UniProtKB/Swiss-Prot annotation:
Its EC number is 2.1.1.14. This is 5-methyltetrahydropteroyltriglutamate--homocysteine methyltransferase. Keywords: Amino-acid biosynthesis, Metal-binding, Methionine biosynthesis, Methyltransferase, Repeat, Transferase, Zinc. NCBIfam families: met_syn_B12ind, PRK05222.1. CDD domains: CIMS_C_terminal_like, CIMS_N_terminal_like. Its cofactor is Zn(2+). It comes from Blochmanniella pennsylvanica (strain BPEN). Belongs to the vitamin-B12 independent methionine synthase family. L-homocysteine binds at residues 437-439, 490, 605. It comes from the Bacteria. One of its GO terms (biological process) is methionine biosynthetic process. The gene is metE.
Amino acid sequence: MTIVGHILGFPRIGLHRELKYALEYYWDGKIKEDKLLEIGRTLRIRHWKQQKDSGIDWISVGDFAWYDHVLTTSLMLNNIPDRHRIGQENINLNTLFRISRGYSLDKKLIPPSEMKKWFNTNYHYIVPEFVPNQEFKLNWTQLFDEIDEALSLKYTVKPILLGPISYLWLGKIKGKKFDRLSLLPNLLSVYQEILDILLSKNIDWIQIDEPILVLELPLQWLNAYLSAYEQLHGKVKLLLTTYFDSIYHQLDIITRLKIDGLHVDLVSNPDNIPLLHARLPKHWTLSAGVVNGRNVWKTNLHDWFKKLYPLVGERSLWIGSSCSLLHSPIDLNTEIKLDKHIKEWFAFALQKCYEIKMLCAALNAENTSDATYEDTLSEYYISNNLRSYSSTIHNIQVKKRLEHIDEISYSRSSPYTTRVTLQHKKLNLPLFPTTTIGSFPQTEEIRKLRSRFKNNQINKEDYHLNIKNYIKKIIMEQEKLDLDILVHGEPERNDMVEYFGENLNGFIFTQNGWVQSYGSRCVKPPVIIGDISRSKPITIEWISYAQSLTNKPIKGILTGPVTIMSWSFPREDMQRKTIALQLALSIRDEVIDLEKSGIGIIQIDEPALREGLPLKRSDQKQYLEWAINVFRITVSSVKDDTQIHTHMCYSEFSDIIYAILALDADVISIEAARSDEKILKSIRHVIKNLNEIGPGIYDIHSPNKPTQNDLIRRINQLLKYIPEQRLWINPDCGLKTRSWPEIKHSLNNMVSAAKLLRKQFYSS
């Protein structure tokens, strides 16, 4: 039996982020739809060829998406919220963008669908919406069109389809509550139709993704798998695909399914290969996800060879990535500035394809007693074996400081009830204080300035002078808007994680290591390669300068340790807890220096706190314990009258509400504008125990411009759950990606709405 290689998906954005720019040009009206479609087609053809040239046997089709793959699935199933059908006879590309971004109709804002994190990654998906008695039907033909494209180029095609049970689980109910599984029979009829079409195209295998099987699911959802795959089996061979965690707890159910193969993320749990082999039906194909799709380190191919070799000849075996390579940068060969010794430690998406080819070749060759491949695998990883001796990754002072971590208090010196009185006296803020989350528009001019400085085209003095001029403008604009708490706007920061990584020891940075976060939004995560420490203050110059320009309080913005770790590519030779503690000590030093410089409000952004939560509930308690302690170590040194804020992004806050309480931040702002009242309803039983909260009164990711009345309605909604003395008024996220005209309009209406309601409360 020949062992074949495949991947679970390939990055779609393009080596130079071509898809990002094409989407933004299209949204801005700078290119037509036919040009956008042409760019997408060019990217797909290039990516298929790259996979084939790298030695991949089955070419994945269906991983390309104009915004995200879950939304693509919704369109294929004709699951379009009624508010996005208005004025549109047929589903088209603009329908997709309406759902993901929102739009205006007759001066009325039509909100986008909710956006959520894709499991425990920094990728986001647009949440499907379900109503009682909803009917699905086959509509959007993107998958079939792309299969035809690939077949015309003579590739061996493996279509990718999000499975029906996971699709239902990932969605949300709109309106009256009902059992989402009641929609399954109708949904399965559409999936059968899809499989019939694939059969007519002579498709042999389909990758059907059911990632929720790694969760600890209710029994009725597990039982739904049995009937669903009984119904779907027999048309095209089904490779049931799971990722991001182990599925050993579900083997009793999985082994009863009518499928033809199973993909398992072995990176998450590599030690149970013998158990898998013993438990899975002998006629099934086992797809071994051994190349990490979520990190950039080389794979220890020789180690995997030894683990997988006993299966050779015993069953049908595929070698694959642990998950989609969507979460990986594309090509290491473009990183011409990386130190060559450090570069040898890494593998990006194309190199990961080559790793799969190498492992397949070695396992296949072993069938013919050719052992030379095994030596090649050992040589491939030798640089990573030597890494543990590198002075680049070790810092004795950091290790010594960690040894004494228990000497640091995990708590503020006084409880919130004491602190709040001192803080209110010092800050003298009105009811419904207004602020922003931190960043202001990153104009082309600012980006060019940073690029020129990075490329040594201007000196440090000129760069600092220009950045301070931008800060001055940002302060002036905020004062004109009459915001209560100001920020310096972060013009010096390219990215909230990359900026801090650049100013800490233990990180390296890529030129082209971009990965998609959502839609056209891409991030370039730094790589943590060694022990982390702070050599000098990072933000003091900019934030202190901002405070010198105004009598209003300036809020210093820092990225928190858990988020820096989660949004970087972490070390694989160190536990996440230890990495986070190293970061906590570094950011703690910055907090101390900010307070010494006279900054009385400090915000520690932790948007990734929920994201880092293990997928299995039984594993979550331990993570939350150390994540909470990491945050508290970061801020425990400050005085009682220093106000500590934190900010969190798209999250199921009900899952971690007690952890949020345990952070003991004075003010928390959350990204909740897309969620209507859902988040507040889910935590209403503990809101009385929260300190102060700013839920976000408008969605900055949508181009919609909220009116004053829109914002008043939103604030009144919030007041049903939050006492007025504890409610802050703010956008739901940073303003980096918006234009100045947009934010002036929205913030002016936000401040006006707060003032109007403030007046009503003071006079009542």
